[in-house]
Amino acid sequence: TAEWMCQQYEDLNAQYYGSAVEKDDVMSYEWARIPHFYNAFYVYKYATGYSAATAISKKILTEGKPAAQDYIRFLKTGESDHPIELLKIAGVDMSSPLPVQQAMETFNQLLDEFESLL
C-alpha cells in the first residue's frame, strides 16, 4: 500500500541521513516520484548507456580521428533507427557482451586506482 511505502521510505531516510535531514510532512511521499521504483526496465538504461559510452570513448582514445568521425555520424542519425543499430555506426555492438565486459574492466581499473590512493 501507499502507506507501507511511505513508512519504508521514511525509515530508510532516517537510517541513511539520521538527524542531518529535517523531516517534513511530504518527505514520506517522495518515493512516488522516483521512476526507478515503478517503471520496469528503467534502471538498465544507465548500465547500457554507460557501457556504450565507455566503448565509444575507448575507440576514440585508441583510434583517434576515424572513431571520432564515426561518433559524429552516429550523433547525426538522431532517432532514425533502433539504438542498437545506430550504435553500430559508432563501432559499438550492444548485441554482444563486449561493451559491458569492457565497461566492467574499466570500472575495475578505476576502482583499483582509487583503492591504491587510500
What are these regions (language model features)?
Residues 1-118:
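C-terminal, non-catalytic "cap/extension" segments appended to globular domains
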